Amino acid sequence: MWQCKNKSRWWYSLVPILCICIMCYGAIAYSYSFCYVEVWTHLGMKAAAIGMTCLHLIIVILLWIIWAQIIMMGPGRQPRVAPFMILPEMADAGERAKEGAATSVLPPDVYQCDTQGYPVWCSVCQSLKGLRTHHSVHLGFCVPRLDHYCVWLGTVIGRRNYRLFNQFLMCFLMHALIIFVSVVSLQRRIASSARMRGEREDPNVLVVLSLSCLVLLMVGALFISFLNYMANNQTTIEKLYTPKRQPRTMCFCVYNPADQYRYVVKSLPHENWNMWDKGSAYANYKDFLGSSIWRWFIPIGSNIPEFQTSAWEDDYNAILGPYKEELGSHYRDILMQRIEQGKYVTRLRVYGDKFREGL
């Protein structure tokens, strides 16, 4: 189980506790005050009361299970990636054996870099950062496709638990919708029954109705936002870096097989929203949720399998395994066009490219 470091704000831990308390109150108020007292006792609709109570409790238990999986699975952790073999390796076999791991890695076709062509390095993890990888201050290590820290659930959302997070939102919406529809559909009869008895309506029922409306608005908007992000193959962090909000440029070191040079090409701020696009919304959804469509709706496990790699592995793709990220084919074509047009920052020879197949 991933645990957030103590340096996180202390009140972060209080928000999930508050959410748990509200969910427990809602479950009790709906099951007892609405289903048992109002529907069963006052309206005499015993079958409906039993059915709604059972359905409600099943969804509540399912929400607890998904929440637990999100925390236990964690967002994923990028394996350590040694520096790319940009210059000839100076260490001999004895020094490499002393390190107990590969001291350099063959560079991929495209990697994020600075203006000189050197890849992004995480000084805390002592590792290169893969594409779309960010260091989490909450967890203290680099997370593949880091999306955000969910203060409501008290954990970081990343590549490995992203699907579970969206399934949690979907189930929470269903939960709120069932409460809203059932209470609204019987509210007039409940109010009429209370007047006939000369009593007030149970305030717990009205509170539960208000909470369901709040959840439908907040979680509904959040779920729609994430559907839109996935359709465009974006994360929350990437969405924040839009030209209007916080424009930024990135550099990519691109291997050109035509002349066997690498070129450092800058991205433009307006391109951040579509550089990972796989060509269609369906392909982008599969990239986030997995290739098996029916698993999109079954909240069990992750679409990212467990994997291990040897410390001596020097192949970048093998090291990252399922955490490997690729630019969209359309954007790669754009980068290659800029190289052909001479619109690049610099070019360089990379020593590791000599070991490519066919060279």
Swiss-Prot record:
PTM annotation, UniProt: Autopalmitoylated.
GO MF annotation: an example: protein-cysteine S-palmitoyltransferase activity
Membrane topology, record value: Multi-pass membrane protein
Signal peptide span: none
Source organism of the structure: Eremothecium gossypii (strain ATCC 10895 / CBS 109.51 / FGSC 9923 / NRRL Y-1056)
Subcellular location: Membrane
Family: Belongs to the DHHC palmitoyltransferase family. PFA5 subfamily.
EC number, as in UniProt: 2.3.1.225
Name of protein: Palmitoyltransferase PFA5
Ranges for domain DHHC: 120-170
Alphabetically ordered keywords of this record: Acyltransferase, Lipoprotein, Membrane, Palmitate, Transferase, Transmembrane, Transmembrane helix
GO BP annotation list: protein targeting to membrane
Catalyses which reaction(s): L-cysteinyl-[protein] + hexadecanoyl-CoA = S-hexadecanoyl-L-cysteinyl-[protein] + CoA
GO cellular component: endoplasmic reticulum; Golgi apparatus; membrane
InterPro entries assigned: Palmitoyltrfase_DHHC, PFA4/ZDH16/20/ERF2-like
Highest taxon of the lineage: Eukaryota
Membrane-crossing residue ranges in chain numbering: 10-30, 47-67, 164-184, 206-226
Domain notes: The DHHC domain is required for palmitoyltransferase activity.
